[in-house]
Amino acid sequence: VARPRIKDVARHAGVSEKTVSNVINDYAHVSDRTRQVVREAIDHLGYRVNLAGRHLRKGRTGIIALVVPELDIPYFAELARHVIREAEQRSLTVLIHQSGADRAHELAALAGFGSTFVDGIILSPLALTADDLQGRTGFPPTVLLGELLEEGADHVAIDNERAAREATRHLIGLGRRAVLAVGGRDDSGLGTAQARTRGYRAALAEAGLPYDPAALLPVGSFRMPDGARAVSRALAEGARPDALLCLNDQLALGALRALHEHGVRVPEDVAVIGFDDVEGGRFSVPTLSTVAPDKAAVAKVAVQLLQHRIEEATAPDGAVSGVQAPQDRIVAHRLVLRESTEGHERR
Protein backbone atom coordinates (compact mmCIF):
# COMPACT_ATOMS: atom_id res chain seq x y z
CA VAL A 1 0.00 0.00 0.00
CA ALA A 2 1.40 3.40 -1.01
CA ARG A 3 2.15 5.87 1.74
CA PRO A 4 -0.46 8.64 1.96
CA ARG A 5 0.69 12.01 0.64
CA ILE A 6 -0.35 15.59 1.30
CA LYS A 7 -2.70 15.54 -1.70
CA ASP A 8 -4.47 12.50 -0.21
CA VAL A 9 -4.96 14.33 3.09
CA ALA A 10 -6.23 17.40 1.22
CA ARG A 11 -8.74 15.34 -0.77
CA HIS A 12 -9.99 13.55 2.36
CA ALA A 13 -10.34 16.81 4.32
CA GLY A 14 -11.85 18.76 1.41
CA VAL A 15 -9.19 21.48 1.53
CA SER A 16 -6.24 22.57 -0.57
CA GLU A 17 -2.76 21.07 -0.29
CA LYS A 18 -1.55 24.50 0.84
CA THR A 19 -3.98 24.42 3.77
CA VAL A 20 -2.73 20.98 4.80
CA SER A 21 0.84 22.30 4.67
CA ASN A 22 -0.17 25.29 6.80
CA VAL A 23 -1.67 22.99 9.44
CA ILE A 24 1.40 20.74 9.46
CA ASN A 25 3.64 23.78 9.92
CA ASP A 26 1.33 25.14 12.65
CA TYR A 27 0.69 28.50 10.99
CA ALA A 28 -1.53 30.63 13.21
CA HIS A 29 -3.93 31.94 10.54
CA VAL A 30 -5.66 28.56 10.01
CA SER A 31 -9.08 28.38 11.70
CA ASP A 32 -9.58 25.94 14.57
CA ARG A 33 -12.28 24.09 12.63
CA THR A 34 -10.10 23.64 9.55
CA ARG A 35 -7.15 22.60 11.69
CA GLN A 36 -9.28 19.94 13.39
CA VAL A 37 -10.59 18.57 10.07
CA VAL A 38 -7.07 18.33 8.62
CA ARG A 39 -5.67 16.64 11.72
CA GLU A 40 -8.51 14.12 11.71
CA ALA A 41 -7.71 13.35 8.07
CA ILE A 42 -4.02 12.95 8.92
CA ASP A 43 -4.86 10.52 11.73
CA HIS A 44 -7.38 8.60 9.61
CA LEU A 45 -4.98 8.11 6.69
CA GLY A 46 -1.90 7.54 8.84
CA TYR A 47 -0.01 10.34 7.12
CA ARG A 48 3.48 10.94 8.50
CA VAL A 49 5.39 14.17 8.03
CA ASN A 50 8.84 13.86 6.46
CA LEU A 51 10.59 15.76 9.23
CA ALA A 52 14.06 15.43 7.73
CA GLY A 53 12.91 16.92 4.45
CA ARG A 54 11.00 19.69 6.16
CA HIS A 55 13.96 20.66 8.34
CA LEU A 56 16.41 20.58 5.42
CA ARG A 57 14.18 22.80 3.31
CA LYS A 58 14.24 25.34 6.12
CA GLY A 59 17.99 25.09 6.62
CA ARG A 60 17.65 23.24 9.92
CA THR A 61 18.52 19.83 11.32
CA GLY A 62 15.61 19.58 13.77
CA ILE A 63 18.10 18.90 16.58
CA ILE A 64 18.65 21.02 19.67
CA ALA A 65 21.22 20.48 22.42
CA LEU A 66 20.62 20.53 26.15
CA VAL A 67 23.88 21.17 28.01
CA VAL A 68 23.86 20.55 31.77
CA PRO A 69 26.68 20.21 34.32
CA GLU A 70 26.01 16.63 35.45
CA LEU A 71 23.26 14.22 34.45
CA ASP A 72 23.59 12.21 37.65
CA ILE A 73 22.45 15.23 39.64
CA PRO A 74 18.71 14.47 39.91
CA TYR A 75 17.54 18.02 39.19
CA PHE A 76 19.20 18.02 35.78
CA ALA A 77 17.98 14.51 34.97
CA GLU A 78 14.42 15.55 35.79
CA LEU A 79 14.81 18.78 33.81
CA ALA A 80 16.12 16.82 30.81
CA ARG A 81 13.01 14.64 30.87
CA HIS A 82 10.79 17.72 30.68
CA VAL A 83 12.88 19.30 27.89
CA ILE A 84 12.71 16.11 25.81
CA ARG A 85 8.94 15.89 26.27
CA GLU A 86 8.48 19.54 25.29
CA ALA A 87 10.77 19.23 22.26
CA GLU A 88 9.00 16.10 21.01
CA GLN A 89 5.74 18.04 20.89
CA ARG A 90 7.48 20.39 18.44
CA SER A 91 9.02 17.58 16.34
CA LEU A 92 12.49 18.37 17.69
CA THR A 93 15.16 15.91 18.78
CA VAL A 94 17.27 16.66 21.87
CA LEU A 95 20.98 15.93 22.05
CA ILE A 96 22.10 15.91 25.70
CA HIS A 97 25.64 17.01 26.55
CA GLN A 98 27.30 16.92 29.97
CA SER A 99 29.67 19.83 30.56
CA GLY A 100 31.05 18.74 33.92
CA ALA A 101 30.79 22.41 34.96
CA ASP A 102 33.96 22.89 32.92
CA ARG A 103 34.43 26.30 31.32
CA ALA A 104 36.03 24.90 28.16
CA HIS A 105 33.07 22.57 27.62
CA GLU A 106 30.58 25.38 28.24
CA LEU A 107 32.42 27.66 25.79
CA ALA A 108 32.36 24.87 23.20
CA ALA A 109 28.61 24.61 23.69
CA LEU A 110 28.22 28.36 23.16
CA ALA A 111 30.07 27.94 19.87
CA GLY A 112 27.75 25.15 18.77
CA PHE A 113 30.41 22.48 19.30
CA GLY A 114 32.21 23.73 16.20
CA SER A 115 29.59 22.44 13.78
CA THR A 116 26.18 23.19 12.29
CA PHE A 117 24.78 19.92 13.61
CA VAL A 118 22.45 21.55 16.15
CA ASP A 119 19.95 24.31 15.45
CA GLY A 120 20.14 25.78 18.95
CA ILE A 121 21.26 25.19 22.51
CA ILE A 122 19.73 25.26 25.98
CA LEU A 123 22.66 25.73 28.36
CA SER A 124 22.82 25.58 32.14
CA PRO A 125 26.22 27.17 32.85
CA LEU A 126 28.18 26.98 36.07
CA ALA A 127 31.65 28.08 34.95
CA LEU A 128 30.90 30.84 32.43
CA THR A 129 31.19 34.52 33.27
CA ALA A 130 29.52 37.58 31.80
CA ASP A 131 32.74 38.28 29.87
CA ASP A 132 32.42 34.92 28.11
CA LEU A 133 29.12 36.05 26.61
CA GLN A 134 30.42 39.36 25.30
CA GLY A 135 30.73 39.61 21.53
CA ARG A 136 28.62 36.55 20.75
CA THR A 137 27.22 36.51 17.23
CA GLY A 138 23.93 34.94 18.29
CA PHE A 139 24.72 31.73 16.42
CA PRO A 140 23.79 29.15 17.31
CA PRO A 141 20.72 30.51 19.11
CA THR A 142 21.16 29.87 22.83
CA VAL A 143 18.90 30.03 25.87
CA LEU A 144 20.57 30.12 29.29
CA LEU A 145 19.14 28.49 32.41
CA GLY A 146 19.98 29.65 35.92
CA GLU A 147 21.17 33.10 36.85
CA LEU A 148 21.33 35.91 34.29
CA LEU A 149 24.98 36.32 33.33
CA GLU A 150 24.56 39.03 30.73
CA GLU A 151 21.70 41.32 29.72
CA GLY A 152 21.97 40.45 26.03
CA ALA A 153 21.17 36.77 26.44
CA ASP A 154 17.89 34.85 26.52
CA HIS A 155 17.44 33.41 29.98
CA VAL A 156 14.95 31.27 31.94
CA ALA A 157 15.04 30.74 35.73
CA ILE A 158 13.14 30.96 38.96
CA ASP A 159 13.69 34.00 41.17
CA ASN A 160 16.45 32.34 43.19
CA GLU A 161 17.01 35.26 45.54
CA ARG A 162 13.34 35.51 46.42
CA ALA A 163 13.03 31.73 46.81
CA ALA A 164 15.95 31.58 49.26
CA ARG A 165 14.52 34.51 51.19
CA GLU A 166 11.19 32.69 51.52
CA ALA A 167 12.87 29.45 52.61
CA THR A 168 14.96 31.26 55.23
CA ARG A 169 11.89 33.15 56.44
CA HIS A 170 10.18 29.81 56.94
CA LEU A 171 13.04 28.61 59.14
CA ILE A 172 13.07 31.85 61.13
CA GLY A 173 9.29 31.65 61.46
CA LEU A 174 9.77 28.32 63.25
CA GLY A 175 11.76 30.16 65.89
CA ARG A 176 15.16 29.19 64.51
CA ARG A 177 17.89 31.78 64.95
CA ALA A 178 21.19 30.04 64.16
CA VAL A 179 20.67 29.34 60.45
CA LEU A 180 23.63 28.06 58.43
CA ALA A 181 23.70 28.14 54.62
CA VAL A 182 25.20 24.95 53.19
CA GLY A 183 26.87 25.80 49.88
CA GLY A 184 26.49 29.55 50.42
CA ARG A 185 28.82 31.89 48.55
CA ASP A 186 29.38 35.47 49.64
CA ASP A 187 31.14 36.83 46.56
CA SER A 188 30.04 39.18 43.81
CA GLY A 189 29.37 36.46 41.23
CA LEU A 190 26.15 36.21 39.27
CA GLY A 191 25.54 32.49 39.75
CA THR A 192 22.65 30.68 41.36
CA ALA A 193 24.56 30.06 44.61
CA GLN A 194 25.29 33.76 45.00
CA ALA A 195 21.66 34.70 44.35
CA ARG A 196 20.41 32.21 46.93
CA THR A 197 22.95 33.49 49.44
CA ARG A 198 21.71 37.04 48.88
CA GLY A 199 18.19 35.85 49.64
CA TYR A 200 19.40 34.13 52.81
CA ARG A 201 21.13 37.31 53.98
CA ALA A 202 18.08 39.43 53.17
CA ALA A 203 15.85 37.22 55.32
CA LEU A 204 18.28 37.45 58.23
CA ALA A 205 18.33 41.24 57.93
CA GLU A 206 14.52 41.40 57.81
CA ALA A 207 14.36 39.44 61.06
CA GLY A 208 17.03 41.57 62.73
CA LEU A 209 19.42 38.63 62.94
CA PRO A 210 23.16 39.19 62.54
CA TYR A 211 24.98 37.83 59.50
CA ASP A 212 28.18 35.88 60.13
CA PRO A 213 30.29 34.86 57.09
CA ALA A 214 31.23 31.73 59.05
CA ALA A 215 27.58 30.64 58.68
CA LEU A 216 28.26 29.93 55.00
CA LEU A 217 29.50 26.36 54.73
CA PRO A 218 31.59 26.01 51.54
CA VAL A 219 31.32 22.92 49.35
CA GLY A 220 33.45 21.54 46.55
CA SER A 221 30.41 20.54 44.51
CA PHE A 222 26.68 20.23 45.05
CA ARG A 223 26.45 16.53 45.82
CA MET A 224 25.38 14.54 48.88
CA PRO A 225 28.93 13.76 50.10
CA ASP A 226 29.78 17.47 49.96
CA GLY A 227 26.78 18.36 52.09
CA ALA A 228 27.60 15.64 54.60
CA ARG A 229 31.25 16.71 54.85
CA ALA A 230 30.41 20.40 55.24
CA VAL A 231 27.93 19.80 58.06
CA SER A 232 30.12 17.23 59.82
CA ARG A 233 33.05 19.63 59.72
CA ALA A 234 30.97 22.50 61.11
CA LEU A 235 29.64 20.37 63.98
CA ALA A 236 33.12 19.07 64.77
CA GLU A 237 34.38 22.65 64.93
CA GLY A 238 31.75 23.57 67.50
CA ALA A 239 28.93 25.03 65.39
CA ARG A 240 25.51 24.67 67.02
CA PRO A 241 22.94 25.51 64.34
CA ASP A 242 19.23 25.09 64.81
CA ALA A 243 18.48 25.28 61.06
CA LEU A 244 20.17 24.62 57.72
CA LEU A 245 19.36 26.28 54.41
CA CYS A 246 20.90 23.94 51.83
CA LEU A 247 21.38 25.36 48.35
CA ASN A 248 20.16 22.17 46.70
CA ASP A 249 18.48 18.94 47.77
CA GLN A 250 21.62 16.85 47.27
CA LEU A 251 23.44 18.95 49.86
CA ALA A 252 20.39 18.70 52.14
CA LEU A 253 20.22 14.91 51.88
CA GLY A 254 23.91 14.71 52.74
CA ALA A 255 23.32 17.08 55.65
CA LEU A 256 20.55 14.81 56.98
CA ARG A 257 23.01 11.92 57.06
CA ALA A 258 25.66 13.96 58.87
CA LEU A 259 23.16 15.18 61.47
CA HIS A 260 22.00 11.62 62.09
CA GLU A 261 25.58 10.41 62.56
CA HIS A 262 26.18 13.19 65.11
CA GLY A 263 23.03 12.30 67.06
CA VAL A 264 21.22 15.49 66.05
CA ARG A 265 17.45 15.17 65.66
CA VAL A 266 15.65 16.62 62.62
CA PRO A 267 13.62 18.77 62.93
CA GLU A 268 13.55 18.84 66.76
CA ASP A 269 17.15 20.08 67.07
CA VAL A 270 17.89 21.29 63.54
CA ALA A 271 15.39 22.09 60.79
CA VAL A 272 16.58 21.46 57.22
CA ILE A 273 15.33 22.80 53.90
CA GLY A 274 16.73 22.31 50.40
CA PHE A 275 16.16 23.39 46.81
CA ASP A 276 14.91 21.56 43.69
CA ASP A 277 12.25 19.11 44.99
CA VAL A 278 13.99 16.01 43.65
CA GLU A 279 12.39 12.62 44.07
CA GLY A 280 14.84 11.43 46.74
CA GLY A 281 13.64 14.11 49.14
CA ARG A 282 10.14 12.64 49.11
CA PHE A 283 11.46 9.31 50.41
CA SER A 284 14.21 10.39 52.82
CA VAL A 285 13.74 9.99 56.57
CA PRO A 286 12.59 12.55 57.47
CA THR A 287 11.10 13.72 54.20
CA LEU A 288 12.77 16.89 52.96
CA SER A 289 11.26 20.37 52.90
CA THR A 290 12.37 22.15 49.76
CA VAL A 291 11.93 24.94 47.24
CA ALA A 292 10.21 23.40 44.23
CA PRO A 293 10.90 25.10 40.89
CA ASP A 294 8.32 24.45 38.20
CA LYS A 295 10.64 22.28 36.10
CA ALA A 296 7.99 21.63 33.47
CA ALA A 297 7.53 25.38 33.03
CA VAL A 298 11.29 25.97 32.82
CA ALA A 299 11.48 23.39 30.03
CA LYS A 300 8.43 24.69 28.19
CA VAL A 301 9.52 28.33 28.22
CA ALA A 302 13.10 27.46 27.27
CA VAL A 303 12.10 25.28 24.31
CA GLN A 304 9.50 27.79 23.11
CA LEU A 305 11.99 30.63 23.30
CA LEU A 306 14.73 28.63 21.58
CA GLN A 307 12.40 27.55 18.79
CA HIS A 308 11.47 31.18 18.18
CA ARG A 309 15.15 32.14 17.98
CA ILE A 310 15.84 29.29 15.55
CA GLU A 311 12.99 30.47 13.33
CA GLU A 312 14.38 34.01 13.40
CA ALA A 313 17.88 32.79 12.53
CA THR A 314 16.81 30.59 9.61
CA ALA A 315 13.97 32.67 8.15
CA PRO A 316 14.47 34.01 4.61
CA ASP A 317 15.43 37.68 4.32
CA GLY A 318 12.40 39.85 4.94
CA ALA A 319 10.34 37.02 6.42
CA VAL A 320 10.79 38.33 9.97
CA SER A 321 9.64 41.88 10.61
CA GLY A 322 11.97 42.43 13.56
CA VAL A 323 14.17 40.44 15.89
CA GLN A 324 12.75 40.16 19.39
CA ALA A 325 14.90 41.64 22.16
CA PRO A 326 16.60 39.16 24.53
CA GLN A 327 14.12 37.72 27.00
CA ASP A 328 14.56 37.28 30.76
CA ARG A 329 11.80 34.85 31.78
CA ILE A 330 11.07 34.07 35.43
CA VAL A 331 9.00 30.96 36.16
CA ALA A 332 7.17 29.97 39.32
CA HIS A 333 8.45 28.22 42.42
CA ARG A 334 6.82 27.18 45.69
CA LEU A 335 7.79 26.00 49.15
CA VAL A 336 7.05 22.33 49.80
CA LEU A 337 7.00 21.81 53.56
CA ARG A 338 7.71 18.30 54.81
CA GLU A 339 8.99 16.55 57.92
CA SER A 340 12.51 18.03 57.97
CA THR A 341 11.13 21.41 59.07
CA GLU A 342 7.55 20.76 60.14
CA GLY A 343 7.81 17.37 61.81
CA HIS A 344 5.02 16.28 59.46
CA GLU A 345 4.15 16.75 55.81
CA ARG A 346 1.87 19.71 55.17
CA ARG A 347 -1.08 18.71 53.00
Annotated model-derived regions:
Residues D32, L45-G112, T116-G120, D186, ...:
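Amphipathic helical "hinge" segments at domain boundaries
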Residues S124-E166, D186, L209-P210, Q250, ...:
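Flexible loop/hinge segments that line or gate small-molecule binding clefts
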Residues S232, A236-A243, N248-R347:
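Flexible loop/turn connectors
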Residues V1-G62, E345-R347:
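N-terminal helix-turn-helix DNA-binding module of bacterial transcription factors
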Residues L51, P69-E78, I96-H105, V156-E166, ...:
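Hinge/beta->alpha junction and helix N-cap segments in small-molecule ligand-binding domains
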